[in-house]
Amino acid sequence: MSASLQLQQLQRPGYTIDLYIPNAQEVQNIYFQQKQVQAQVPFPHWTKLWPAALAMGDFLHEHPELLKDKKVLELAAGLGLPSFVAARYANTVCCSDYLEEAIAAMRKTVLHSQLNNVTCELLDWNHLPSALTTDILLLSDINYDPEQFDQLYLVLQRFIQQGTLIILTTPQRLMAKPFIEKLLPLCKQQYEMTADNTSISLLVLQK
């Protein structure tokens, strides 16, 4: 069972963007139904547009020079907002997630917006193809599960060693502080931003 997708036009500072987003009430209803059957079922976080994704989109809009003629990959893209902003300036964009439902939603946005330079792929950062490369890696609000921090750090190291520029946004969660501190030696630039009344840190990482 899946929530219906609704086309929304987001009004952001200096730009607008169309995005297919699952109906929030239907998402809640389906989640509570599933929870009655399986108490440990996780909430589908991909169905919501998070402040870190908004901040990433705003940053990319303000810094198109980072994306010009580049190959861009977003991991755990969810609804894909940063990818779709990047597509306005980049050569090619791959927006990926490990959930089929998220991929279906992003593909609907791609078709609606006729984004010929965007592909949507099913990718799990625990099992990335060995040949996968990119010029720029986008990661927004991916450091929310401490159990994933070690694997996530290995993924970041892999792309850093390839010469990839990584742009990462994260809300300032206390539990994520050790993970972010571990990345600071790789940090070339750091910005403090606000989106939806939430403080967001943006890190630009490169070897």
Walk through the language-model features, giving the residues of each.
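S-adenosylmethionine-dependent methyltransferases
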Residues: 1-207
